[in-house]
Amino acid sequence: MEISTPDFGFGTEDSSAQQSANRAIPQPVPAPAFPLKETASDTGGTAPTFGTLQDNINELCLRYQTVCSEGRDGTGGGGPPGGGIRKDAFADAVQRARQIAAKIGGDAATTVNNSTPDFGFGGQKRQLEDGDQPESKKLAAQGDCEYGPRGGAPAAPPERSGPVGDPPGPPRAERGRRPPPALTGGALPSAALPPQLGPMHPPPRSTTVTEEYRVPDGMVGLIIGRGGEQINKIQQDSGCKVQISPDSGGLPERSVSLTGSPEAVQKAKLMLDDIVSRGRGGPPGQFHDYANGQNGTVQEIMIPAGKAGLVIGKGGETIKQLQERAGVKMIFIQDGSQNTNVDKPLRIIGDPYKVQQACEMVMDILRERDQGGFGDRNEYGSRIGGGIDVPVPRHSVGVVIGRSGEMIKKIQNDAGVRIQFKQDDGTGPEKIAHIMGPPERCEHAARIINDLLQSLRSGPPGPPGHGMPPGGRGRGRGQGIWGPPGGEMTFSIPTHKCGLVIGRGGENVKAINQQRGAFVEISRQLPPNGDPNFKLFIIRGSPQQIEHAKQPIEEKIEGPLCPVGPGPGPGGPPGPAGPMGPFNPGPFNQGPPGGPPPHQYPPQGWGNTYPQWQPPAPHDPSKAAAAADPNAAWAGYYSHYYQQPPGPVPGQPPAPTAPPVQGEPPQPPPTGQSDYTKAWEEYYKKIGQQPQQPGAPPQQDYTKAWEEYYKKQAAQVATGGGPGAPPGPQPDYSAAWAEYYRQQAAYYGQTPGAAGPAPPPTQQGQQAQ
């Protein structure tokens, strides 16, 4: 018998009670194969799954089966079967199914119209027949019932048990995929759902990107920082992993790998750009808290290799003063494995104008070092910070300091200044003595130092000739033949270093001649003392050319040149050589001064290495007579200097044109060499035969002057009259010589007996013999 299906009131809008009553009720659906149970989704526990949806659909079918059975028994009447309670139960089951579908499908559930009813969770899923899921899941996901069109015949009951299988009706290929009319009301709004069953949104996927970025190769050290401090801070602040390639491959830029989210990568790039901009001296960016929490402008300047010590100073004194004066913080960035011969970055942190001022101060220090004591300096050196810098040859620093600092202390006390030698890398030919104090006192101290250095380069003056100006200052620190007056310099070099000066095939000497404009050659003469361990070299040219030619030679022998001396002065006879030098051995350690010790030319204690600076002695009237006759002074000097038996007074030479015995020292043993007339004649002949160098000043011939000079001296001595003739016997200089050597012995810690040779005998005794 056919029973009309009651209308439950949740069909389409055109449905009426009469049509619902006339509708045939399908056969009852068998009970589900597994019992219904409450799931976690009913209590808001775990997230719903397709299995949960399957359970609720089974419950829905079971309740619908109950409704159909009651309607078939005739208990439903014309209204809804079971009254409002059953209708509410069925609607509740449908609502629960929709909620679970919305929970699983999220916002994918769509509202459909009446003409095309569909599940909210099925519109976006593909056909499951082609899926790769197991068969049981395919059936469970497809639904439990199929309903025919309204007004049609009731469908046959299903042949299989279990609500999850194929529902009764036509074959799968002919069946539509429409849900029951009660399920076509669309998805519930999310506001109507409980919080635990609200629409689910898939969590955003974490996107990680890797990007290659390039930075200047010279800025890699700044990016890494000391001990990796900088790069670690970049990674922590940006959340991006930063990896720098170990080598640039010779390219000006180095690759940097940035790994992280797009936002982190972008932030890391901004931080890298900011570091590079600061390293190039550009304006600071928004990331400026890089240097140990120091805010402000950060600028990096590169300090050339070997000059970092100038900026740091002794014990960090210079860099501390720079920081205090400029009000900034300075940090040297140096890796422990970094080569010491590469430039080092100096990081300056502070206010913009203070950083700029500090940079200028550092560059001033570097420029002063590059000038090396020359540049735009005045007579005594360039003025820096209210003082004066005086360049001192490196081999003469010990002379300025003196033994145990006696000389430099005396200069400081006399001038009222403070003198300090600047620290350097030790490669330059000079060292800078910085004088601090009032300007006029600094100039006075600089004048003393320059006079001291000049006295090292020049020997003490000889005695004045009678009626003529004083003789020229003897050059050099060793005994030997005097060179011509200007345009030439003779010096000795150890034999084992001559090859370094000459070079292979004479290439070094040729290069000096071409580049310096002077003419350098080796002399065939033996050294003055006949020592085979030394060779004589001659440099000819202008004074400037000679000075330029000396520099490469001193570099080759790693020491200063010791000139034998220039020619005699235009007035009187030249003074003898000063103390011996390191390459000019003499017969004894300390050479006598340029003349006997009358008050006009007091003895000065310039030693081999550390001199004793003495002020001029006061005027002594008792020695005035000794200064009246220069011939007597020369006689006493040469009798002691050459340690020879007393001979005739130098004012009575054997020949009128022969000068007194002065030139060559005796060959060992120093006896039996009393007549050097022929040697002097040969010397002056050579001078007259030497060709003039192009551009050199013309050499004067003093032969006739010397002849005339000694003729006058001989005539005065023979007649016993004339100015300057001694009224009686010649004065005795033994006491003066003894005092001179006592001073030297006291300075060098020697006993008076070991200071040197014995003083010469009295002139009276010499005349008596």
UniProtKB/Swiss-Prot annotation:
Region annotated Disordered, chain positions: 1-48, 108-209, 456-490, 558-628, 644-769
Sample GO molecular function, one term: mRNA 3'-UTR binding
Composition-biased stretches (Low complexity): 152-163, 743-756
All copies of domain KH, residue ranges: 208-272, 296-362, 385-449, 486-553
InterPro entries: FUBP_C, KH-I_FUBP2_rpt1, KH-I_FUBP2_rpt2, KH-I_FUBP2_rpt3, KH-I_FUBP2_rpt4, KH_dom, KH_dom_type_1, KH_dom_type_1_sf
UniProt-listed GO biological process terms: 3'-UTR-mediated mRNA destabilization; cellular response to cytokine stimulus; intracellular mRNA localization; miRNA metabolic process; mRNA transport; negative regulation of nitric oxide biosynthetic process; positive regulation of mRNA catabolic process; regulation of mRNA stability
Comp. bias regions, Polar residues: 13-22
UniProtKB keywords: Cytoplasm, mRNA transport, Nucleus, Repeat, RNA-binding, Transport
Keyword Cytoplasm: yes
Entry GO CC: cytoplasm; nucleus
Main location: nucleus
Biased composition (Pro residues): 196-205, 563-585, 645-671
SMART domains per UniProt: KH (SM00322)
Family of this protein: Belongs to the KHSRP family.
Protein task: Part of a ternary complex that binds to the downstream control sequence (DCS) of the pre-mRNA. Mediates exon inclusion in transcripts that are subject to tissue-specific alternative splicing. May interact with single-stranded DNA from the far-upstream element (FUSE). May activate gene expression. Also involved in degradation of inherently unstable mRNAs that contain AU-rich elements (AREs) in their 3'-UTR, possibly by recruiting degradation machinery to ARE-containing mRNAs. Binds to the dendritic targeting element and may play a role in mRNA trafficking.
Identification of the protein by name: Far upstream element-binding protein 2
Gene designation: KHSRP
